[in-house]
């Protein structure tokens, strides 16, 4: 199992509001919201990701979570630093 898929496995039940808090702690800011519930977050170094947000307690599907994690470029060490993984 590679690091990306293991990170998805560890974060598969993470509520969206906790993922958004971690994005903001990592320096991402809300660029804009779409009419369909998507929130576009951007980092000063040029990374951009879209998080679909309807209810804070919702979780993302594994495929969507993997896409977000690939876009932000987090590793397991980053997830630990941001408090997502013990």
Question: Which stretches of residues belong to each language-model region?
Answer:
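Basic nucleic-acid-binding interfaces
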Residues: 1-86
